[in-house]
Amino acid sequence: MLFPLQVAAVTSSVRDDPLEHCVSPRTRARSPEICKMADNLDEFIEEQKARLAEDKAELESDPPYMEMKGKLSAKLSENSKILISMAKENIPPNSQQTRGSLGIDYGLSLPLGEDYERKKHKLKEELRQDYRRYLTQGITQGKRKKNFLSTSETDPSTLGVSLPIGERLSAKERLKLERNKEYNQFLRGKEESSEKFRQVEKSTEPKSQRNKKPIGQVKPDLTSQIQTSCENSEGPRKDVLTPSEAYEELLNQRRLEEDRYRQLDDEIELRNRRIIKKANEEVGISNLKHQRFASKAGIPDRRFHRFNEDRVFDRRYHRPDQDPEVSEEMDERFRYESDFDRRLSRVYTNDRMHRNKRGNMPPMEHDGDVIEQSNIRISSAENKSAPDNETSKSANQDTCSPFAGMLFGGEDRELIQRRKEKYRLELLEQMAEQQRNKRREKDLELRVAASGAQDPEKSPDRLKQFSVAPRHFEEMIPPERPRIAFQTPLPPLSAPSVPPIPSVHPVPSQNEDLRSGLSSALGEMVSPRIAPLPPPPLLPPLATNYRTPYDDAYYFYGSRNTFDPSLAYYGSGMMGVQPAAYVSAPVTHQLAQPVVNTVGQNELKITSDQVINSGLIFEDKPKPSKQSLQSYQEALQQQIREREERRKKEREEKEEYEAKLEAEMRTYNPWGKGGGGAPLRDAKGNLITDLNRMHRQNIDAYHNPDARTYEDKRAVVSLDPNLATSNAENLEDAANKSSGHMQTQSSPFARGNVFGEPPTELQIKQQELYKNFLRFQIEEKKQREEAERERLRIAEEKEERRLAEQRARIQQEYEEEQEKKREKEEEQRLKNEEHIRLAEERQKEAERKKKEEEEKYNLQLQHYCERDNLIGEETKHMRQPSPIVPALQNKIASKLQRPPSVDSIIRSFIHESSMSRAQSPPVPARKNQLRAEEEKKNVIMELSEMRKQLRSEERRLQERLLHMDSDDEIPIRKKERNPMDIFDMARHRLQAPVRRQSPKGLDAATFQNVHDFNELKDRDSETRVDLKFMYLDPPRDHHTLEIQQQALLREQQKRLNRIKMQEGAKVDLDAIPSAKVREQRMPRDDTSDFLKNSLLESDSAFIGAYGETYPAIEDDVLPPPSQLPSARERRRNKWKGLDIDSSRPNVAPDGLSLKSISSVNVDELRVRNEERMRRLNEFHNKPINTDDESSLVDPDDIMKHIGDDGSNSVATEPWLRPGTSETLKRFMAEQLNQEQQQIPGKPGTFTWQGLSTAHG
């Protein structure tokens, strides 16, 4: 039940005075939370006090205790104070203890013996341990797991259960662990150094005790300390204490009581070990302590290994007077007070370099005053400076006084309130500073927080990029503890028995002020960067009760750069420089060093030398004694030896650590650990086993038990390719690895081989079986791949054959189609050739018949000419002609001229052709010349056909002239002529106008004409029947109407011609030749009608076969009125049947060539020619009666023809239209030129242009 009392007392202490509870900035932050718990625990504290009062009553009533009745009440009250103050301060049990601090020896002053006290303390310790285990039972495992992960160790409780899974701690956890580790190391050093000094002091008899008491009255150490403390407290007291001084004394008393109480737990054990340590003090206490640490049953070996590693990482915090292994002696129960919050244990140790000088010093007299040195420590719970000697004396006097707690009043409460407020402000500043540091670390993305330079995840040079490498010349001196100004120190005493000479200014607290200087505050913590610097100018003298607000943690971290990446920056060799404590001290005193782990032969000499060398007490002698110099030299040599040993050990540990890192690097698996769902891989990252395939094989084995043999082999085969490694390699790897790191194998046999044993025969056999099975699998896989490749090859060949056959079939079909196409083309070509041949034969037959007819016609013409000559001669003799009318003189002269014969025409044509050929430009193509030469042969035949057509036209015109009045207007459509030749337009890049038929509908007049023509065509008549046979469809527009009207007129004219030919024998023989001559020379409006009705709707210039060019066609081609026959002549011709000049009707245009296929119908031409020949024969055989003109005309047809106005019918059938072939045009142009040459004075006579090219 003691431990809950401690917790409650701590809470109460924090509430009363939080400055006394501060250990570090982190514990300051926790203090508000603890203050909140204080109100709830007040009742619990009162109950504990009542229980203690009951115990007191029982002890008083007990007979063995009645012997000490006079002292029991005081002691028991002081014991209660000790318990409460210990719980408040929570001072570690091995903290510093002074010889004359408290005059109470709890438990040892009873007459029950040492066995009773030993059992009592043992029971108390067991109760504490049980209660602590109860509190930390559920959380210790998780915290230990984090500790294992942070130190890269393996939890032994998880061995054989599962593979360790590497977890990463957060930055906050790593920071906390690193801080705890650093401060624990610091506290352990302080504890061990203080323990060493206490052991030396216990072995030394105080000088004041010898002076006041005889030797026979000396009692055991603890009893003598109590009596000495009480005797020292009875010394005279010159000063009157103020409330502040009383408060300071009370605090000192509490601290001393707590140190005393903490020591009681280990007092029996220390008493047993004291004699052994005395004998082994000179040799070294580290070996014995190491053995004691190793012999502890509560701490496992694995934890001991971790302590070694921590020492390696925290080497920079070692002190020159600190043994490397002393820190391991600290018991594990002092590390943490409670594992549920991992709070830093209040283990307050002191590792200052002059700690051995601050033990229980013998009292020195100054003017009758007893000067006693008390053990003043730097407490992280009160942030106090070293108290002065007067305060210590008053505290020692109050130790035996029950009224010590009643010396301060309202003024002390105000001071406590001010300190609390100051403490609260400091906490707020620290919290703000911590937030700023976190924000800066986050902004700069630093990987170093407050975890120090030993973070295993960060490289030593990680801060170079931020230019934060340590710069010694820029660093500032850490804060110093305040001190009172002092005079120049005097040289120390040569002998401790000589009384000191009083100083010039006898200040009672001079020695304490000297101890509170720079050497006292920073001697063991300040790094060597401030060693050669003198202290700053001294401040004015301070009051004796002045308290600094800083604690040990402030001075500890203030003198160190936690972000320094260099390990050597805080090496053990650099931390042992003693700073200059005084400005005016001699050089010999500034080099004073503490005595570490050395025990002289004379205890009194050692103690006095420690006091002298510490520089805390000065004497009047100017030179030290030989003994002090000798001890100083021995201390220096001892320090040099220890430093060399320490460096050697550090080198060994560094080599061991590097070897361990190399071993870890060799065993590092970049692919991660297998198992737990992760695939098993070899060193190269390849999968060792395929779990999916194994699962399928298991299913197949369940359904097919016959194949179970292969599955059994797979199940027992080792999967670890590293089992065949040699035994030496396994041993070497196991030696290089840390004991906390477990080497996990990716094999099912790894659990039996975790310590590097060589593989057994069974494992080797299984490995061979596995290798054979792997080879079997490889062969089987190769066979499957080969079979697959063969199957693919066969499939590809089959596909290629199919494609080849398909290509051949397509090619054959294509060739067949091409052959069929060629056959069709050949057949079509043969058919065309046959048609052409037949057409040529028919053409030749027609030409032969034409030649025969032409011959017959020539004979007839010759016969007619002869008859005309005979008739002319007869008429000359019979009567004289009437006088010629002047208007008809030119016409008559033209009538008297003989028409040219066929031979003359041919000769003139050849002549003109030769002349035009000589003058023709080299424009025409060769083909036109060849074609013209071939066409020359057919010119005569064409002329004969033209004569027949002229004869029929002549008769038609004669009939019309008889029935027309002289004042009838001849409507002639004129066409605008393009004044520019077509080639000139092409040369000037002009577009020739094209006349197209208007798309408009029929007007009323045209529609009426069509209707009347249809009625006329339906009448029964021979000519109309032929017209219906030729034109089956009725006319639809003006153009077709003109064509059919012209055809009807032509048929009627044929009928009239036949009638006239029947009565041709009766006509005068001169009428026919004169009429034919006039017909041949009759001027015609050839150009106007040709261009007006031609299908070629543009004015074009044409080039002849021999290169001649046609002249421009004139629009004014109508004969003058003088050339028109008069009414008298028309009446005369009517009665005499003479042909007179008159305007000829319009001729339908013809845009087709003479020998075009569309205009030549061989069968129709043959029938018509036969009909003409028949009529011609009848005309020759039957005599013509020229006097009876009525026999030549059909009265009905004449009357019907008169009623029809054919002036608008200017079109004709294509084969009856005027010739438009180039040959006829050229021939007519030649004829025109020839006629103009013969009769220059008569232009425009005898033109062949515009004649019909019909073959009928």
Swiss-Prot record:
Protein name (record): Centrosome and spindle pole-associated protein 1
Region (Disordered): 189-244, 381-403, 735-757, 813-853, 913-932, 1114-1147, 1232-1256
Biased composition (Polar residues): 222-232, 736-748, 1246-1256
Superkingdom in the source lineage: Eukaryota
Upper taxonomic lineage: Eukaryota, Metazoa, Chordata, Craniata, Vertebrata
Residues spanning the membrane: none
Record PTM text: Phosphorylated. Phosphorylation increases in colcemide-treated cells.
Organism, scientific name: Homo sapiens
UniProtKB keywords: Cell projection, Ciliopathy, Coiled coil, Cytoplasm, Cytoskeleton, Joubert syndrome, Microtubule, Phosphoprotein
Phosphoserine: residues bearing it: 244, 459, 527, 901, 920, 966
Tissue expression as described in the entry: Expressed in adult and fetal brain with enrichment in the cerebellum. Detected in testis.
GO CC annotations on file: centriolar satellite; centrosome; ciliary basal body; cilium; cytoplasm; intracellular membrane-bounded organelle; microtubule; nucleoplasm
Signal peptide: none
Subcellular location, record wording: Cytoplasm, Cytoskeleton, Microtubule organizing center, Centrosome; Cytoplasm, Cytoskeleton, Spindle; Cytoplasm, Cytoskeleton, Spindle pole; Cell projection, Cilium
Statement: the UniProt record of this protein carries the keyword Coiled coil: yes
Stored Pfam families: CSPP1_C (PF24578)
Keyword Phosphoprotein assigned: yes
Main subcellular location: cytoplasm
SUBUNIT field: Interacts with PLEKHG6. Interacts with ARMC9, TOGARAM1, CCDC66, CEP104 and CEP290.
Basic and acidic residues bias spans: 189-208
Clinical note on disease: Joubert syndrome 21: A disorder presenting with cerebellar ataxia, oculomotor apraxia, hypotonia, neonatal breathing abnormalities and psychomotor delay. Neuroradiologically, it is characterized by cerebellar vermian hypoplasia/aplasia, thickened and reoriented superior cerebellar peduncles, and an abnormally large interpeduncular fossa, giving the appearance of a molar tooth on transaxial slices (molar tooth sign). Additional variable features include retinal dystrophy, renal disease, liver fibrosis, and polydactyly.
Coiled-coil segments on the chain, per record: 38-62, 114-135, 244-270, 417-449, 625-669, 925-964
UniProt gene name: CSPP1
Function: May play a role in cell-cycle-dependent microtubule organization.
